[in-house]
Amino acid sequence: MSKHFVITFQRQRGLSLVELMIGLTLGLILLLGIIQVFISSKQTFATNDAMAKLQENGRFALEFITQSARQAGYTSPGSTLSRPFPVERTVCGVGNTGNNPCAVNGSGSAADVVGFTFEPPVIDGAKRDCAGAVVPDNNLVVNAFYIIPADANNPTAALGCKSFNRTTNAALSAGQRLIDGIDSLQVLYGIDTGGNSQSVNQYVSADRVSNWGRVVSVRIAVLANSVDVLNPAPVQRNYYLLDAAPFSSNDGRARQVFTTTVQFKNL
């Protein structure tokens, strides 16, 4: 008995226009989701990088200043130099003229200036100031810290330092940018009102210090920014540094206040 096989052919059907449009729509939605995740990841990375830079700027700025503050008033063992006041309050030449004192209280939210006097210790075979210039033996140095404003070549303000030889009254280092992204520097001076305990009774600004011999500590605050502009920009707010008027900016950069206190040991 023979068997017969019947082969039937099905007509091939393609996608309808509606199905094609639905597929394209789903594909676009998926693509938009991937793009959104990519953009969000990029923004998160940029924000985290900016915040890390901000933290680094603030910590390094305080470290530069406190290195000099901890040495303030120091003279090496056996030195013939008279022990200086830790805080220098006479002419520093910070700014555009040579008539600016080292201890300046900025008006309102304007930055302060602070200078510390000491005999530099020998490091790597030489005595150096805050900018790395060599200081001769048996000479006192003054490291003065201040804020260098932004300009056409530098979009953000910076912590600056310049120094001079306190023994000869000669300039050592011209103004140097130390740390970019520092908007403000504020300083308060701890006063021992009794004059015999080296214990702080009050903190005051430079213009309220009547007896620099009773200054036994210094409180320092800096306002650091992220240098890079963030997108989306942080919400504009006020930043409070010690007794200064609030600082505010809407330039799209993140900011944070860093504060420390240094007790003078060389009194």
Regions picked out by a protein language model, each given a short descriptive name:
Residues 2-8, 12-74:
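Aliphatic-rich helix starts adjacent to a transmembrane/signal segment
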Residues 6, 49, 53, 57-60, ...:
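Short linear sequence signals and composition-biased patches located at protein termini or domain-edge surfaces
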Residues 15-18, 114, 143-145, 157, ...:
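Residue-level detector of short, conserved catalytic/binding motifs and their immediate flanks
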Residues 24-27, 35-37, 84-89, 150-155, ...:
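N-terminal start-of-chain detector that recognizes signal peptides
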Residues 37, 41, 157-159, 189:
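A short secondary-structure junction motif
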Residues 83-154, 160-162, 167-170:
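C-terminal globular interaction/adhesion domains in large, modular proteins
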Residues 155-158, 179-181:
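Catalytic core of tubulin tyrosine ligase-like
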